[in-house]
Amino acid sequence: MTVKAPSVTSLRISKLSANQVQVRWDDVGANFYYFVEIAETKTNSGENLPSNQYRWINLGYTANNSFFFDDADPLTTYIIRVATAAQDFEQSDWIYTEEFETFATNAYTFQNMIEMQLANKFIQEKFTLNNSDYVNFNNDTIMAALMNESFQFSPSYVDVSSISNFIIGENEYHEIQGSIQQVCKDINRVYLMESEGILYLFERYQPVVKVSNDKGQTWKAVKLFNDRVGYPLSKTVYYQSANTTYVLGYDKIFYGRKSTDVRWSADDVRFSSQDITFAKLGDQLHLGFDVEIFATYATLPANVYRIAEAITCTDDYIYVVARDKVRYIKTSNALIDFDPLSPTYSERLFEPDTMTITGNPKAVCYKMDSICDKVFALIIGEVETLNANPRTSKIIDSADKGIYVLNHDEKTWKRVFGNTEEERRRIQPGYANMSTDGKLVSLSSSNFKFLSDNVVNDPETAAKYQLIGAVKYEFPREWLADKHYHMMAFIADETSDWETFTPQPMKYYAEPFFNWSKKSNTRCWINNSDRAVVVYADLKYTKVIENIPETSPDRLVHEYWDDGDCTIVMPNVKFTGFKKYASGMLFYKASGEIISYYDFNYRVRDTVEIIWKPTEVFLKAFLQNQEHETPWSPEEERGLADPDLRPLIGTMMPDSYLLQDSNFEAFCEAYIQYLSDGYGTQYNNLRNLIRNQYPREEHAWEYLWSEIYKRNIYLNADKRDAVARFFESRSYDFYSTKGIEASYKFLFKVLYNEEVEIEIESGAGTEYDIIVQSDSLTEDLVGQTIYTATGRCNVTYIERSYSNGKLQWTVTIHNLLGRLIAGQEVKAERLPSFEGEIIRGVKGKDLLQNNIDYINRSRSYYVMKIKSNLPSSRWKSDVIRFVHPVGFGFIAITLLTMFINVGLTLKHTETIINKYKNYKWDSGLPTEYADRIAKLTPTGEIEHDSVTGEAIYEPGPMAGVKYPLPDDYNAENNNSIFQGQLPSERRKLMSPLFDASGTTFAQFRDLVNKRLKDNIGNPRDPENPTQVKIDE
């Protein structure tokens, strides 16, 4: 037979928003799993669906006692059901939540550094409308920008383009830096590269490189290559893609990247995906700064091997040219040589086809450049003989001179400059060079010469001197100067697709001779004084927070979601070297969406760093539960309807203030009624305490919350959530758990954020007891000191035990000094009426496993020691209020303390004494039948008076009739004698019976009508008082 698994209880909705819902339930035990399903309960038109037409969607299962669903639709009505299952158990019945409707938007609270402001649009899209793609920190590129000192941030800003003019930047400028040095042999063999703030000096035929991070003031030699650097015709030995530097070698092509960059193969960084390219090196070279580490990319093919004239690259291909032949290789997913007999086995291979630029094998290509994936080649002439070395042989004039552009798809080259005789004349070896800055292509030229086209008629001169005719030279705009390097260059731009070259002025001296570094967008050149010249492009102080791709496990920028709460992490952000004052830092997505603005405490310059607190936490967002507004309806009071203060208006103020039916009188009555009935007023709270048998639990519960919030105002959200979770989970049994050790520790943690040591006897693991036989033992013995001739101890708890039908007492003891031996006479120090005999000596026993059982005991005496660094005056009253196990009395103390704290003044007018007895459900049969029974409604509920709220009773049909006593009543109760009485003699008049409808757990009754009360004029005071003041 298969047992059905227990169903969940207390299924409830703990979080509800537009797109998320979280349900919780009470745990049924270990090894059980919970299946969760959801269904819509209304059609698109808003009509209710019958329950048999619900389309249940399985959301999965969980071992936790909660489930979070984050794919709900806004303004949609759902219902959720949960069932339990486990191995060897049949699935339980489904338990359903109430129907609930999601909201139109989500509600979040945010936790971030106080200096940072979030953009409203970011909050609305990312969180309120649940648009996760607006900014996705897991895969989007996040940027930071420094804003100038005049910038004032508004949360209404949406896109960075609207405020880009406030981003700190610098205009393009050049610097003449330190002197260059020979690397090994000759300074004239040196090639210069500037990349990301580091200067590199390569020397042809050498593997050693000199590097400088202080703009050429000091140089350090380091071997960065495993082979020789090549010998191009121009001073450009390297070219860069967006991520990688490629260097032309004598036999090979090298590639390099910073040692701190991503090392692993990936298409998006243009590394080969065939093998691992690098390992993380860091500063193993001990230079004190990071430099690019170079490795072999491929061996040059035979027709350009050791004779390569120039190199360039795009983001997709590397191009090498020699003797008019162009070979190329992919920058990613290049071909691999799998022939084990080949000298390049397992290396990358160039593409098999060869392109020619001019078709003339004697043509000399001096330089190649690349801009926006367009490749240009500069042909400066040809050698006299085939296969001659252009480095050592004379280069002569050629009809093939010019600038050519590549059509890679068709593998053809088209000449875009040099199509006329004059254009070809302007290209001369020693004077012609080509360069780019990433936007323009520039060509240096030989001297200008007047052509026949420049001779035009001059009618003004002919008229002045009365000549038949005159001519003159027409000067075109050629930007002439004595130094041809300085002023004029042929320049092409994007408007003509870089195919129309026109004379334009240079920005810098010898600009077409510069080398361009794409990664840092800088240009460099060795000037005539052998000094490094670097041109820094227009600069905006923006940066990518993290360059690591989303697929890398090293990526730190992430967003983490947990039950609707979001934590966004990112590394610290640092800017250096800016020369203008900055007021703050703007964070935005690469496509322009503004995220937030970090406002510096004071304006900064040169260096600034944001260090996130907590560590690397950019933002935390917490999903808030929302509740639908319910229309107000009067609260139905089922308890006693206490009198209000309105009848006393005449005694509270002089008659002169009370005019018949005046507005003031009506106001006073309304205000006094508010004091009487309004929740939270002093009279209302005091009345609840005095008039009722116990104060209203709801009000005392809210007061407890308010006290905790007062003390937790400076605690962080995690600790406040811990408080909330504790009380939510314990709200139903809070009163039964007061007094256990955990409640004391919890009190000190949430109220004072202090650890505390609690020593309680139940923490020892064992208890000790003795068995005593006595006819005079009562509960008054608890807490007393008992003694014998050989020992003494304190009594913790007493309980009955029987041996052969004879009543004995098991006495739990503590603080034992000496010995207690069976047969000894035992007495109490402050209870002379007690005498007994020890039947069994001290014996240990295991403690009860459930601490709540201690609360359920009858009168007990325990000693609890509290060890805390706080002074006792600070926590003594709170312990009594909140955790001391004094039953409902602790609420009374709470309210009385509250009245004292708020300064309520009390004047003694009378003392009322009520005498009560308690029902004891084990006190046996009553002596008489019940004198009254409750009046029930047709539905079986007790009727209540509509005015006073009191339960209505009717006379019992057998009131006053003796209750029959069974003949064997004493025998059934073992003829036990307690306080000198047999069971039949211990019966009480109103001992409750389980079928007595007049007595319930919720409706208590004055079992003894003894109330000492004076008549002082209050409503319902007795006409014949049962007590009066002395001398009254």
Swiss-Prot record:
Keyword hit for Nucleotidyltransferase: no
BP term (GO), one: viral tail assembly
CDD domains for the chain: FN3
Region spans: Disordered: 1012-1032
Entries under Pfam families matching the protein: Gp7_5th, Gp7_6th, Gp7_helical
Compartment(s) of residence: Virion
Record key words, sorted: Disulfide bond, Late protein, Viral baseplate protein, Viral release from host cell, Viral tail assembly, Viral tail protein, Virion
GO cellular component terms, semicolon-separated: virus tail, baseplate
InterPro entries noted in UniProt: FN3_dom, FN3_sf, Gp7_dom_V, Gp7_dom_VI, Gp7_helical, GP7_T4, Ig-like_fold
Gene3D superfamilies found in the cross-reference section: Immunoglobulins
Principal location: virion
Function: Intermediate/inner baseplate protein. The gp25-(gp6)2-gp7 module is involved in sheath contraction. Involved in the tail assembly.
Assembly behavior: Heterotrimer with gp6; assembles as a (gp6)2-gp7 heterotrimeric molecule. The (gp6)2-gp7 heterotrimeric molecule further interacts with gp25 and gp53. The gp25-(gp6)2-gp7 module is involved in sheath contraction. Interacts with gp8. Binds to gp10 homotrimer; disulfide-linked. Heteromultimer with gp10; a gp10 molecule is disulfide-linked to gp7 and the other two remaining gp10 molecules form a disulfide bond.
Family: Belongs to the T4likevirus baseplate wedge protein gp7 family.
Protein name: Baseplate wedge protein gp7
